[in-house]
Each structure stands twice: as structure tokens, then as C-alpha cells.
């Protein structure tokens, strides 16, 4: 039988937290210091943790080069402005910080994040104006939404009935950590034998998935949802590649039926690039194999990673 609080001695108060968890190898920056990922700590009183009051952006490094870094910086600073947050760095300062995280980590292929939380209030006030905004960054090994086997055969996607948070509530242009709708959609997909999920908008059209946009190909023409979605950098890159190669690509309403009847479907994310989808709700997309246009765009996408107009080199220590 448990003792009453008045009958048992209090536990000892520790003055240093010992973290038993494992973390990926990498380097983080916070409070002016570059530290191993295992030492990158956030207060439990930070509103970023308590209220998901934060914005972030993620850029990847491939073969020692950032890909489209300026576009990610532009989106990150746009989110800061909309959320009325301020950090002690301009874009060049953030660029240098991200570079140094990668260079110190030694990663040639990396997932690199910049983020700002609302921070903590010294008095635990609920007024967000009292909080001290906190900027952080980190570099960890590159990861993909789709693994090598899924890239080869294509992903199995389930269209969840969950509705994505509408733009009237949270501007999708602000990259954020409001993922509970996406996480519930993922569990819907797992329960139905899928590997990842797509959510709907309030009109019943397809919106986006957990960290990715989606494209449908029909009769050689591409379409991607226009409303209520993050304007992903990889999504934008697909538009750029289509423009260069003369392919038709349009942002418009895409219904679940449009996806199911498409010749090809693929998803796009910084975490993986252009990734094929060959099954939706248990039924094959087209002939059930990775489509030629998806393959063509995927190959072009990775080829552009060495283009100095689209990429920035990392200067690693000798």
C-alpha cells in the first residue's frame, strides 16, 4: 500500500538532469553556443513546448551543399514576421549559423533546421509579449519520408477523413508544429494498412500530408492542391522544373477521386524530394508502378543539387 505524502520522506532534489535518451549524431546552436545534439535543451516552460507557439524551417544538405537555402530563409523570416517574433540575427547571420552547424557536424547529407519559439516568460505570464523569443538551429543526418524500398516500389497512401487545420485558423505559410491532425491521420493510415496519410480540406478536397505536398499526373498534366497547404520549397521546385521542361503544372482543387483516377501520383518534401505513390486506399495508381514522369522529375530534381544557382557549398574543416 502506498504511503500518504505526510508519512513518507520526500525524494532527493537533483540539481542536474541526467538524460537517459539517445539522440542522432549532430550539432545544435542555442544561446550563442554550438553543442552536441544531446546537450540541446529546451525549458518545459517554453511556450514552444507548452503551446506549440513556434515557427521553423528545414533545409537539406546533399553531397556537401545546401539546396535552395535562400528560399527556406525567406519563408522562415516571413513566419517570424507574421508571428511577431524577433531573433538577434539577420538572414546572413542565420545562414552562417546553419553552415557552421553542418560543418561542425561533418554531415555531407543533412537535415538542417532553424527554429524560433515564443520562449518563456520570466513570470510565467500568459501574455505572449512577455516571453523572450528563442532561436535555435541544428544539423542531423538526412532522413526521408520514404525509405529506399518505398522509393523503388512507391508508397502506399491512405486518404484520411481528418480535416487539415484551415487557413482561417493557422496560416499554412507559417511552418509550424501543429501536427495533431496530421498525427491522427497517420494513425488512420496505419490502421488501414497504409504507410502515410493525406488529409482533406473543409471542402472535402485533398490538402496535404505530414510534412509533404502531393501531385497528381493525368494525361501528362500535373495538378497539386492550391488551398490550405504549405507552399513547400520542393513543391515550388517541381513547378520550376516543369516550367523549364515545358510540362503543364497547375495548383487547383484536387479531389480524392482525382488522385484515385490519376495516371501517376507523387509527394514532395525537403525530407526525401520527389517520392512516388503507387497505392491509394489499397488500390493501384495507374498500373501500380512508379510512373515515367515521376521518375523523370525525380532525376532532374537530384541533378540540380550540384547547380550553383540552386545550391550553396559547405566549407568543412580540413
Q: What would you call each of these model-derived segments?
A:
Residues 198, 205-226, 231:
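Glycine- and Gly-Pro-enriched alpha-helical subdomains that act as flexible
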Residues 1-198, 202-205, 230, 239-318:
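Conserved alpha/beta cores of soluble small-molecule-handling proteins
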Residues 234-235:
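Secondary-structure junction motif
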Amino acid at each position: 500500500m502506498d504511503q500518504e505524502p505526510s508519512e513518507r520522506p520526500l525524494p532527493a532534489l537533483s540539481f542536474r538532469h541526467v538524460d537517459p535518451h539517445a539522440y542522432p549524431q549532430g550539432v545544435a546552436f542555442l544561446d550563442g553556443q554550438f553543442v552536441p545534439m544531446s546537450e540541446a535543451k529546451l525549458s518545459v516552460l517554453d511556450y514552444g513546448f507548452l503551446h506549440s507557439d513556434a515557427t521553423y524551417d528545414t533545409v537539406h544538405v546533399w553531397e556537401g551543399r545546401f539546396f535552395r537555402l535562400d528560399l527556406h530563409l525567406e519563408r522562415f523570416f516571413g513566419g517570424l514576421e507574421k508571428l511577431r517574433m524577433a531573433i538577434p540575427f539577420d538572414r546572413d547571420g542565420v545562414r552562417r549559423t546553419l553552415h557552421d552547424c553542418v560543418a561542425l557536424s561533418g554531415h555531407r547529407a543533412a537535415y538542417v533546421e532553424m527554429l524560433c519559439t515564443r520562449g518563456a516568460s520570466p513570470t510565467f505570464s500568459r501574455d505572449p509579449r512577455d516571453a523572450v523569443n528563442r532561436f535555435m538551429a541544428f544539423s542531423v543526418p538526412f532522413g526521408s519520408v520514404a525509405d529506399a524500398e518505398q522509393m523503388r516500389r512507391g508508397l502506399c497512401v491512405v486518404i484520411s477523413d481528418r480535416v487539415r487545420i484551415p487557413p482561417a485558423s493557422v496560416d499554412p505559410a507559417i511552418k509550424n508544429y501543429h501536427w495533431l491532425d496530421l498525427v491522427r491521420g497517420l494513425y488512420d493510415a496505419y490502421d488501414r494498412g497504409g504507410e502515410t496519410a493525406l488529409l482533406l480540406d473543409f471542402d472535402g478536397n485533398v490538402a496535404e500530408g505530414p510534412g509533404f505536398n502531393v501531385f497528381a499526373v493525368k494525361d501528362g498534366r500535373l495538378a497539386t492542391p492550391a488551398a490550405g497547404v504549405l507552399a513547400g520549397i520542393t513543391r515550388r521546385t517541381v513547378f520550376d522544373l516543369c516550367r523549364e521542361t515545358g510540362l503543364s503544372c497547375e495548383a487547383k482543387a484536387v479531389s480524392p477521386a482525382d488522385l484515385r483516377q490519376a495516371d501517376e501520383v507523387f509527394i514532395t518534401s525537403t525530407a526525401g524530394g520527389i517520392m512516388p505513390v503507387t497505392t491509394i486506399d489499397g488500390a493501384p495508381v495507374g498500373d501500380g508502378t512508379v510512373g515515367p514522369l515521376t521518375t523523370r522529375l525525380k532525376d532532374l530534381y537530384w541533378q540540380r543539387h550540384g547547380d550553383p544557382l540552386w545550391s550553396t557549398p559547405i566549407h568543412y574543416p580540413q
